[in-house]
């Protein structure tokens, strides 16, 4: 048995030294345990690429769990962006600049068509799009969200984003697979549909695959706003 204690400062990763030793010593079995002696940590962004490494400086971890529907949910306080939601290791929303996204998302649809009797939100678990729909005066908002646990932790830790949108009388939450749920919706129901899904290729493909289902429940001259 050989034991090593690697200590590094800043962004230097001790795994580099471990990789060198693995090649030289050629042990059949290696057990490693990592811990941080500092008050902050570095979160490795999954969109890093060869020649470009991107990190978020983490000040505090508020939530880190796997939800009942299988999503890895984290609420982290980032040095630059404040409290932020990560799902499956992808940054979804940060309290510092969220309003720029949500307000633009909703306003873009209203500029094309000002009708706002009702709207459907597909996803948007942080509550920002729902908040904007409420502030713009939509009479009825159907919010189709897969994971209620995401909504709960965002209401707890990112309260400025959602502003308790689920508690508003104009909002109806429909939990579960949104594209299964809308199969039960009548034709031409909504003035606006906002598709605010996770930032991954699977969700982009999912929305594209179901575009005809979304068009079916949209009123003539209605608008669909989606993140692509």
Report residues per predicted region:
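The AdoMet/dcAdoMet-binding core of the Class I SAM-like
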Residues: 2-46, 70, 93-228
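Non-catalytic substrate-recognition/targeting regions of SAM-dependent transferases
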Residues: 26-87
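Residue-level marker of positions within ordered structural domains that often coincide
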Residues: 80, 90, 110
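Gly-rich Lys/Arg/Thr-decorated short loops/hinges at beta-loop-alpha junctions or inter-strand turns
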Residues: 85-88, 195-197
